[in-house]
Amino acid sequence: MSSTHLPGGNQALLGCSATELESWAVAEGQPAFRGRQLHDWLYAKGARSFDAITVLPKSWRISLQQRGLTIGRLLEVNRAVAVDDTTKLLLATVDGETIESVGIPTQQRLTVCLSSQVGCPMACRFCASGKGGLQRSLATHEIVDQVLSLREAMDRRPSHVVFMGMGEPLLNIEAVLASIRCLNIDLGIAQRRITVSTVGVPHTLPQLAELAMKRLGRAQFTLAVSLHAPNQELRERLIPTACAYPFETLLQDCRHYLAVTGRRVTFEYILLGALNDQPQHAEELAERVRGFQSHVNLIAYNPIDDEGFQRPNPETIEAFRRVLEQRGVAVSLRASRGLDQNAACGQLRRQHAAIG
């Protein structure tokens, strides 16, 4: 291992395991315990700079900085807090890009919603994240930092993680899996409390199943597949990239994922007023997922300022849920949070860009 580079040739420490940091410290001519000290300051104490890690020899800290190594922390440039304490952070990367992360508190838990890319290439009609297209994928340390930044901002330890922010996680599989390993092992968040959401990218679900077993030993996180429609025609209207991924092929890949990992799949379905929220849509959806070891999570649409989609009324939402339940489908309704502070995915970033 090079004495001037971190594992994998990275320049940021965040994302490295205790074992990797110990081995790297030894390669740097330091005792192995220096690596354990680094690990403690990175993950338990949330250090933002080498200067803050005063237990390390000053000469080594200076050397690390001179060689361009960093902790890998991002800079908070904006914060929005809703009346229910839902907190959205706008974080800046070293190359000047911005990403969003959201903390969603309840009395029992703190769920953090993470971005996996800067922007998004999927261009879903109802989502703010894809309006500006994709700039790039995030590195592992940029994903992990979002959890630390929300922990600092909310002064509370996150208990659950969902990859439901900006970007398509399955177009950044390696960094997402590396960050899951870090969140699990280094930050102590159980895999079963981590959810990876995807709109569906051809050939990636089998790849995810295989890589998760290799990288993590076992895939215990939850896979959430965003359907948002009960048939191919309507799905293509809402998700342009769906034209390359037939509905039945997507479901077959979900069955393969279940067979390989033993983990049931969650199907996400955003309810759009008068478009996909009628009883006949619920009947068709129930027919699609019947007999599938799965769970359907309904999401009422969060309005975006310049879009024509509408949020269904509560009676329509309940009627849709009831149809699924009566057809034997396991179903839940996600509570909407942070509506008063532009906390829907991608909205704070768009607002910041418009001002800037």
Curated annotation (Swiss-Prot):
A GO BP annotation: rRNA base methylation
Cofactor(s) essential for the protein: [4Fe-4S] cluster
Residues of the Radical SAM core domain: 106-340
GO cellular component labels: cytoplasm
Pfam short name (any one): RlmN_N
Residues annotated as binding S-adenosyl-L-methionine: G167, E168, S197, S226, L227, H228, N302
Record bears the keyword tRNA processing: yes
UniProt catalytic activity: adenosine(2503) in 23S rRNA + 2 reduced [2Fe-2S]-[ferredoxin] + 2 S-adenosyl-L-methionine = 2-methyladenosine(2503) in 23S rRNA + 5'-deoxyadenosine + L-methionine + 2 oxidized [2Fe-2S]-[ferredoxin] + S-adenosyl-L-homocysteine; adenosine(37) in tRNA + 2 reduced [2Fe-2S]-[ferredoxin] + 2 S-adenosyl-L-methionine = 2-methyladenosine(37) in tRNA + 5'-deoxyadenosine + L-methionine + 2 oxidized [2Fe-2S]-[ferredoxin] + S-adenosyl-L-homocysteine
Entry's cofactor comment: Binds 1 [4Fe-4S] cluster. The cluster is coordinated with 3 cysteines and an exchangeable S-adenosyl-L-methionine.
Domain of life: Bacteria
EC number assigned by the record: 2.1.1.192
Role according to the record: Specifically methylates position 2 of adenine 2503 in 23S rRNA and position 2 of adenine 37 in tRNAs.
Family recorded in the similarity comment: Belongs to the radical SAM superfamily. RlmN family.
Protein name, per record: Probable dual-specificity RNA methyltransferase RlmN
Source species: Prochlorococcus marinus (strain MIT 9303)
Gene: rlmN
